[in-house]
Amino acid sequence: MDSTDDDFGDLYVDDAKFQATDAFESECATNSGEDKGFEETVKSDSEGEVKKFDVVAKDSSPCDDDDCAMNLTEADEESEFSDSDDDLNIVLKDDDSKALPASCVFNTNFGGYEASKASSFQRRWTRNASANNACIDPSLGMSQYRYSFPNPWSRTPFDVNLDVLEKKPWRDPGTDTSDFFNFGLNEQSWKDYCKPLGRAIEVRGGTLERIPSADLRRPRDPDPGVVIQIPVTNDVEELPVRTPEKARCITSNEASRSDVSHSYGSKDLNSVYGSPKDEAFVGCQEENAGSFSGEKSLPTENCCSREATPSDKEMLEKEKEESVCNSDETDPSSVERESSLGDRIRLSPTSSSSVGINEESDDYETESLKDSATDDQREVSTPPQEARLAEHEAISIKRGEDSGTMHSRHRRSHEDSSKRHCGRAGYARYVKDASPTPDPGRGKKVGSLQGLYRDSNKNWQNGPPITLERDETEGKGVHYYREKSHGRLNSSVDHDRHREHRFGWRNNKESSLGRGFDHSNSYKCGTHLKEYTSRSSFDLNQRNSRSSFKEEDDRYGWHHRERKYVHERSPIRAYENYKERNGCDWLREPYYEDCIPITDMDYRYRSENSSAHAIHNLKHSPENDLYCRRRGGYDYNLHRDRYEDGVHRVESRIPFELAYREMRSFAEVEMREYQGYKRHEEFSEIEKRHHYIHDWHLDRFVSEEDGYKYRIQDGWSSPSLSLRDSWYTKEAKGDFRRDDTRDFRTPEAYDSQNNHFHKAAPRDGWTQNLGRSHNVSVKDRLQYDADWVGPDRGRYNMADDMQCSMREVSNSEHPSYTDEIFVRDIRVPTHNRMATKQRFGYLQSHIHENDERHHRSKKLRGDGHAFIKRQDHVDLAGRQGKVSNQSKKRFSNGGDTIEQQDVQKPRKLMGKSEEKAMQNRDINDKEEGEIIEEVKGVEIDNERIQESLKKMEKRRERFKGTKLAVEATFKSQTELRAKADVTNQQRPVRKRRWCAS
């Protein structure tokens, strides 16, 4: 015999086909009748030749003990002197061989062995590979390697076809099948086990086509291009470790008493070994016949078919309908029994697995088939390990106990068969219950693969009933609903409540205006007082009663995506609102309530606990502590969290540019009224300044201390005042400077408020009320203005680079000059603006301070001298760049003070209109280049315009010659410099060239 390439080829006689003969036909005739054990030693010599034992054919001569002992002795002697590392010494005991005597094999077929009539999948052991000892031990089970079978080496023990065997000794009466089949298998179960091994499982695409019979793992998106290949395992010794002992086959004596265990054993078999078959046979051998208890299985070729027959489909449909009909009558014992067994019954892979089931277990099997995937294209993936099954069972039982049931996968008893998702494409629909009458199944627990939710009536006061919507685009192999969130299924209300408890706020796309500035008041308009934040104190009932929508019509606040100012923001309504909320008789913030469209800023700084830095008196109450706030920092901190509960500004759906303009456009220089203090008549203007700006401590955010957006005194000052702080002058009946282009109100509301508190006056794009009261001294206004605007000068590039008067600021967005705002081109008619110095009694020192502040750092050409130029109002009327007779050009050597400049004022020539105005004012009340207008307004004198035009022409002629001379001088200097540059550049070039050569 030729040696093989395999290292272990000498262990087996590959060219001699061993097969077992009938166990009862021939025995090894031994004197003792016992074979305690044997040893097989294989030795290869140093030359690499494999020494094999030839099998000698003897005519039915039994082997005797002397020959066996002699062969064993020779083998032992050879193994002692073996120097090869490849020697293999296998010692096995034949204790199990007593159950079935070993049969001898004869070499009668050209050195081979005739076909055996015994089982071909039994383990075969050759004793010294001799004819006397070549016996088969059928009780040792399957082979550890594939080489022990007569099949070609490329075949496996699973390829053995039991039907071609002539004799089937395991069918003989009184024979223990465990002697022929391991792990409690029988003939049919072994066939079912061997068939699908190594078959490729196709992963189908699409979603929601089926419900897996046991989906114990997280759902994953299937990849249609992936093919799962189940490898064929050769290590059969691992199987007893992974298989529980109770998965033994049920013998014929126990078949009548334990029908349920059939499916149980079948589950363990198929779940552990992962056999994806559609039809399984569970049964055992009867005593006197080769038939099995229960229904007979389908033919072998149909056992593992991937598609079910039409009759099977009809049967499955009937079973589903029966399971739904019996679902309402299910007793708790069935649920308990189902949960106690875990998913063992659900893992039964086929509808025919209910063989041998009597009447007692009909309902039990119906439950097991209820959740199994029995559609026409069902595929069963490899089930998880036993540990995963146990873990999932424990988790499911615990979840069921927490929610009031034993098992979380209790069927949806309130749904009929037409609404159950049975795993087919035809069932992929929306299940909606939009009937106006209450659902009789409401209040029951609805189960799914992911958890439970309670469809309770208490969550729906008068709203529509719950809607279970099937989302075709979300689910991948399992059920998904639109309300699914945070790992469980919720209704809309439960979902939002869960988010409220988890995050502390609601993100439901509803504007703050619609729900009364309460972020928790999403679905209940007339809700009771609820905490806005931990420090909230304002009452929402007034706003809720004024809300202009219904919950049923606008549940999610779609009507409030856009800002709509309806009855709520009328002036009269605002006035009543102030009286009710604050207990006062006067209108405190008419400007903010009707003018500013930011919905949540009205109550932003209200707090239960009064600030520690605020000024308190007897009338001070905690609710009114933070009412008047500096709104400062909105332009710098525009993207900070607008609400104390952390909701971003975007949630209120206010456009960014509108909010930016709102914050930058209102800055008043008067004092605001505060309810906690005594009335304004009891204070002088200076006292009001000291008493009313108590909230300078709010000028910086200190959220790291208390988590709220407050500001402190030693921070940078506010670039803009509070949007609700109006200029407080004399009962708030005057001195309101508005900007209609930034005022998002209707003209009717604006006129209504002005007619109520102000004098009627013409208005245009940049509204200036010419008819306002004149009882307030400009002195006090400028005093406060200078004090508030001064710290902010460093933050704006105002008019320092422009030629303008002290009060004429071209930058319309400056927060402190709302009193005099003009368009950028400065060409504004005179009647549209108002002179800032037209009031009596302001001090000259205030003018000096403002003058110095506005022009301190203005450096122009002229040997380092400060050039101060002021345009008069005639220049604004159209003669830009001209210095009128009321203006002057003055150079100071840097040391001149403002007082020295003012000494020259009386010597300045004045126009007719200024001379007329000087009769009504003190001489110290004037500033150079200023037009003093009377109350009714002064039109520009045509005579003065002509005079100014003539002077402008003279000035041009005077500087014309100077300009030409300067240009000529500059041109000559430029030519000389250019010649020198050319001369200086030529020499180095020639030198470099010479050096380079």
UniProtKB/Swiss-Prot annotation:
InterPro entries: Fip1_dom (IPR007854), FIPS5/FIPS3-like (IPR044976). It holds the Pfam family Fip1. A motif (Nuclear localization signal) lies at residues 397-404. The keyword Nucleus applies. GO terms for cellular component: nucleus. Keywords: Coiled coil, mRNA processing, Nucleus, RNA-binding. Residues 930-963 form a coiled coil. It is found in: Nucleus. GO terms for molecular function: RNA binding. Its main location: nucleus. Residues 250-272, 289-475, 534-553, 880-900 are annotated as: Disordered. Signal peptide: none annotated. It comes from the Eukaryota. Component of the cleavage and polyadenylation specificity factor (CPSF) complex that plays a key role in pre-mRNA 3'-end formation, recognizing the AAUAAA signal sequence and interacting with poly(A) polymerase and other factors to bring about cleavage and poly(A) addition. FIP1L1 contributes to poly(A) site recognition and stimulates poly(A) addition. Binds to U-rich RNA sequence elements surrounding the poly(A) site. May act to tether poly(A) polymerase to the CPSF complex. Component of the cleavage and polyadenylation specificity factor (CPSF) complex. Forms a complex with cleavage and polyadenylation specificity factor (CPSF) subunits CLPS5, FIPS5, PAPS4, PCFS1, CSTF64 and CPSF30. Belongs to the FIP1 family. This is FIP1[III]-like protein. The lineage of its organism: Eukaryota, Viridiplantae, Streptophyta, Embryophyta, Tracheophyta.
